[in-house]
């Protein structure tokens, strides 16, 4: 069973409270006054913004990312939430679509190729070098200390230095890349809206397409304990054996 812990209208109130507190404390965050104005507008319009991604570090600690830099954090298993948006170093408040935990670091990615890296357990998310200029939908550790980011129109970048610089990986597809997972074997699986699945056996340095193209747009993938890869797309759920 499921129990609602937080909705967008509540998040707007939390955002307003955090922004007002930051302004009152003369916060150095340049986005605090803008956050106050935006939260007041959203509350007046009764307009909640969506959550887009979640990362859980333990049964108690989690961070949720969303539209317009919306970020919420819980340290008690979701009993209470705090707005964490001003801890994302993005005064223009871009959408945040995905995240990855790589070693002790947390990466968050979003619009305009923006990548944020937390080295303090999620307390702060300064920007690192952007990975291109198009929207990024997700990130994944490569298993050797590197990180991949992927997104719109076949965008795929790899960094081996914590996001200080990025190398573009040329792919034969211009479809949006939607998900990436690490298989039990250590290989990396990359999925796209075109129905093509790519696989890497060298920590994400190169990818090859699997022979069969699925007859649907792929939005997410996960590997079951028995090794089956479960694909979710616009036509339902499909199990694949590797």
Segments and roles (model prediction):
Residues 1-242:
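Residue-level hotspots at or immediately adjacent to binding/recognition sites across diverse folds
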């Amino acid at each position: 069973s499921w129990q609602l812990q937080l909705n967008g209208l509540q998040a707007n109130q939390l955002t307003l409270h955090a922004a007002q507190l930051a302004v009152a404390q003369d916060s150095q965050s340049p986005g605090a006054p803008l956050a106050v104005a935006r939260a007041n507008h959203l509350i007046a319009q009764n307009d909640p913004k969506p959550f887009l991604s979640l990362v859980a570090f333990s049964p108690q600690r989690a961070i949720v990312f969303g539209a317009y830099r919306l970020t919420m954090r819980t340290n008690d298993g979701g009993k209470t939430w705090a707005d964490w948006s001003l801890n994302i170093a993005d005064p223009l408040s871009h959408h945040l679509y995905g995240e990855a935990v790589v070693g002790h670091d947390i990466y968050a990615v979003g619009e305009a190729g923006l990548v944020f890296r937390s080295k303090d357990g999620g307390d702060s998310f300064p920007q690192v070098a952007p990975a291109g200029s198009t929207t990024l939908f997700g990130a994944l550790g490569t298993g050797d200390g590197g990180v991949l980011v992927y997104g719109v129109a076949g965008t795929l970048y790899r960094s081996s230095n914590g996001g200080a610089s990025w190398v573009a990986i040329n792919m034969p597809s211009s479809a949006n890349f939607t998900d990436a997972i690490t298989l039990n074997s250590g290989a990396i699986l990359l999925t796209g809206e075109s129905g093509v699945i790519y696989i890497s056996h060298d920590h994400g340095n190169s990818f090859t397409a699997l022979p069969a193209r699925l007859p649907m747009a792929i939005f997410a993938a996960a590997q079951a304990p028995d090794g089956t890869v479960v694909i979710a797309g616009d036509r339902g759920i499909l199990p694949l054996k590797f």
